[in-house]
Amino acid sequence: MDQLRQSLLEAPIIEKGEYEYFVHPISDGVPMLEPGLLREIVIKIIRKADLEDVDKIVTPAAMGIHISTAVSLMTDIPLVVIRKREYGLDGEISLSQQTGYSENDMFINDVSEDDRVLVIDDVLSTGGTMCAVLDALKSTGAEVVDTVAVIKKAGPNELDDTDHHVKTLINVTVEDGEVVIVDENGDD
């Protein structure tokens, strides 16, 4: 059994309002992230993603950073972090991020027209963050070569009625307070 699958099956579940939320080292930084789990995920991303002619890896703060940093180190592709803080730099683009339980403004720097980017994130759940990121990148004139989320929480999301496509490594749902594996190979 692979480490990602096993770690999800063992993940504790908490409730935020009516939203069942699994607590996992990849999506939350707790419990502790074992190097072997991160290594496994990075290898799976590198194998699944189209990396040909990618200029930059783009990831939303905060929980995509550790994954994307490791992919950047393994591929020598520079990393751009979408921040929740405005810096006012030339070319900075703002976007509104909405998740199942929060809403924030985020800011993209260092992405320009004709850049070819790979977008990486930890979890695709409501699709709010990913949809906002992909729309904002499109508005810059950058080409999104590929998009990968490590974990997809199954069910409808904001990307369903768009032309955005996101690959995932594993798809899960939460039923009766437990993580259930829906597709251990994720979406291609």
Curated annotation (Swiss-Prot):
<dbReference type="InterPro" id="IPR029057">
    <property type="entry name" value="PRTase-like"/>
</dbReference>
<dbReference type="Pfam" id="PF00156">
    <property type="entry name" value="Pribosyltran"/>
</dbReference>
<comment type="similarity">
    <text>Belongs to the purine/pyrimidine phosphoribosyltransferase family. Archaeal HPRT subfamily.</text>
</comment>
<keyword id="KW-0808">Transferase</keyword>
<dbReference type="InterPro" id="IPR050118">
    <property type="entry name" value="Pur/Pyrimidine_PRTase"/>
</dbReference>
<dbReference type="GO" id="GO:0006166">
    <property type="term" value="P:purine ribonucleoside salvage"/>
</dbReference>
<dbReference type="InterPro" id="IPR000836">
    <property type="entry name" value="PRibTrfase_dom"/>
</dbReference>
<keyword id="KW-0660">Purine salvage</keyword>
<comment type="function">
    <text>May catalyze a purine salvage reaction, the substrate is unknown.</text>
</comment>
<dbReference type="GO" id="GO:0016740">
    <property type="term" value="F:transferase activity"/>
</dbReference>
<protein>
    <recommendedName>
        <fullName>HGPRTase-like protein</fullName>
        <ecNumber>2.4.2.-</ecNumber>
    </recommendedName>
</protein>
<dbReference type="InterPro" id="IPR026597">
    <property type="entry name" value="HGPRTase-like"/>
</dbReference>
